[in-house]
Amino acid sequence: MSDHQNRGQDFSLEADSELRFEIEQKDAKVLVTLVNGFAELFGTELVKKKKYEFGMGAKVAIFTYQGCVLHVTGKMDVCYISKETPMVQYVNCHAALEQFRTEAEEKDRRGPVAMVVGPTDVGKSTLCRILLNYAVRVGRRPLYADLDVGQGAIAISGNVATILIERPASVEEGFPKTAPLVYHFGHKSPSGNSVLYNAVVSKMAEVTLQSLNGNKRTKSSGIIVNTCGWVKGHGYAHLLHAARAYGACAIFVLDQERLYNELLRDVPSSVHVVLLPKSGGVVERSKELRHECRDQRIKEYFYGNARAPFYPFSFEVKFQELRLYKIGAPPLPDSCMPIGMKAEDNKTKVVAVTPTPALIHHVLALSFAESVDDDVIGTNIAGFCCVTEVDMERQVVMLLSPQPRPLPPNALLLWSELQFMDNHT
């Protein structure tokens, strides 16, 4: 590191501007300190004189409404100040949602359900984070529903999930992932099984909307829904399905006029559809980077991070004790289906999986369902484990798990296409 990087640099930001930087180097570390003024990261206020640490993969945009001075130390691949920022429009969206919440509170009704939609890499997760942070800063307790199975902001990829947001996100680590409601999907894109995807979205929407009635504060706070970046063809149909399932009253469309006009045409006129610009700081991610991000999320699930390391367990399970299933059977023509069944029904069929070496590295979901006779699709997930070894001779699999052996009684494991190479040393 050069002397300049060691000493750091002061950045003076005018009102309504932001400091943007990216870190791509694997072992790079950047420290940011708010020297004076007021600033925030995606809706979370920075504390003066406190050092914030960012590592590889960080794409940071620190915004100020009033002006501030930031001290930055470390090696960044990109770093600049921008006065072109959509933050004022985003805070206007928050203000509109607050009007809905106030009205809901007065009339004891459900608060607003707002969906954030748009193609990949336009900042959907970031806008959700901003809206959620602003909501809790004024005393709300909204729910955050994440339907993006490709990246996963709450659970690991391949799942849909919901959490209650009670405090602003940590600047460095985002929202705490405590007590999420997670439903298994098992694929990195809704295209992996469109019928199943709609089924789990419907189930999570049903359970989430019911849960609002249990707490008056949360009921009036409503839900922010994050979505996948697949917005054409079947992907667009999934967006419409989610909007109906959640009863969305507002849809924020990021950076695509075509999608905005399609939604204006296809959703009820009572739904507020708003076109918003993406931030100039949003960066397009390569296929490789997306894969790395998915891998990192799974690694953090098992091993934590430098600030809060976890120590997972490895243990063997005999084939005969392994109750492993997959949701979705190979497609068959209607002529080969049992009477009364359609080919679509096969997409939600629960089928047994025989352990083979092909199972190595696959992530498995541990369902709260106790039997395949239960509603497996409609039952949420307790956690995840990963197959690190399959010994055909001894008829055992080796599992990496956050919990020690044994597996819970009647444990029902669900296959997913997600894989994780456990190279942790």
UniProtKB/Swiss-Prot annotation:
GO terms for cellular component: mRNA cleavage factor complex; tRNA-intron endonuclease complex. The keyword ATP-binding applies. Pfam families: Clp1 (PF06807), CLP1_N (PF16573), CLP1_P (PF16575). Keywords: ATP-binding, mRNA processing, Nucleotide-binding, Nucleus. Signal peptide: none annotated. ATP binds at E18, K59, D121, V122, G123, K124, S125, T126. One of its GO terms (biological process) is tRNA splicing, via endonucleolytic cleavage and ligation. It comes from the Eukaryota. It is found in: Nucleus. GO terms for molecular function: ATP binding; polynucleotide 5'-hydroxyl-kinase activity. Required for endonucleolytic cleavage during polyadenylation-dependent pre-mRNA 3'-end formation. HAMAP family: Clp1. Belongs to the Clp1 family. Clp1 subfamily. This is Protein CLP1 homolog. It comes from Drosophila pseudoobscura pseudoobscura (Fruit fly).
